């Protein structure tokens, strides 16, 4: 959720895994919405990190959606990259809960806010977890996983599994 600098980087991270498809929720569908992702992938191609074919495969696994319900209703793992404003994050998670599956994991990419506080307005707080990607998220392998007071063991383990599948090193 959020197609800014971190949201675009994380979309790329997850789409690099052939088993993962990404829906990037954005407020508007601009014609140039893929440009930041393409620019990063082009650099990776020029440095022989990925091939041109891999670039196209990654792009094919990323779709954009403006409707929050459509973006989240079938998701297994939802990560928000919203502005660092507590009420914004709390309200966003509370709204997402209205649409997403009961077993979907709700992750926050915050670097400074408590996942416990972010989960305060959620009904199913046990599925909220922190997943702090270091910037630039598509290059740095480390991801800090922060369990909220309510986070279930299963959600913590599944989050670590998803991050490993995306090629990251969760700690």
Please tell me what each predicted stretch does.
Residues 124, 145-171:
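Internal alpha-helical scaffold of NAD(P)-dependent oxidoreductase catalytic cores
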Residues 77, 82-143:
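Rossmann-like NAD(P)(H) cofactor-binding subdomain of soluble oxidoreductases
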Residues 44-99:
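A structured beta-alpha segment of the ubiquitous adenosine-cofactor-binding alpha/beta core
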Residues 24-27, 143-147:
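Short beta-alpha connecting loops at secondary-structure transitions
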Residues 12-15, 97, 119, 160:
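A structural alpha-helix within SAM-dependent methyltransferase catalytic domains
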Residues 1-43, 47:
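NAD(P)+-binding Rossmann beta1-loop-alpha1 motif at the extreme N-terminus of oxidoreductases
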Residues 22, 106, 170-171:
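Hydrophobic beta-strand scaffold residues
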């Amino acid at each position: 959720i959020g197609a800014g600098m971190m949201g675009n980087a994380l979309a790329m991270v997850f789409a690099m895994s052939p088993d993962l498809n990404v829906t990037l929720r954005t407020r508007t569908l601009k014609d140039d919405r893929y440009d930041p992702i393409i620019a990063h992938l082009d650099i990776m191609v020029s440095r022989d990190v990925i091939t041109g074919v891999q670039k196209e495969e990654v792009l094919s696994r990323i779709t954009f959606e403006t409707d929050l319900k459509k973006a989240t209703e079938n998701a297994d793992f939802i990560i928000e990259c919203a502005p660092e404003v507590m009420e914004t994050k709390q309200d966003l998670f509370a709204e997402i809960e209205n649409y997403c599956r009961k077993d979907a994991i709700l992750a926050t990419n915050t670097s400074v806010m408590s996942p416990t506080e972010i989960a305060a307005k959620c009904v199913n707080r046990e599925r909220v977890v922190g997943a702090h990607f270091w910037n630039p998220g598509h290059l740095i392998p480390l991801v800090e996983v922060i369990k909220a007071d309510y986070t279930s063991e299963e959600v913590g383990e599944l989050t670590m599994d998803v991050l490993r599948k995306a090629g990251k090193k969760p700690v």
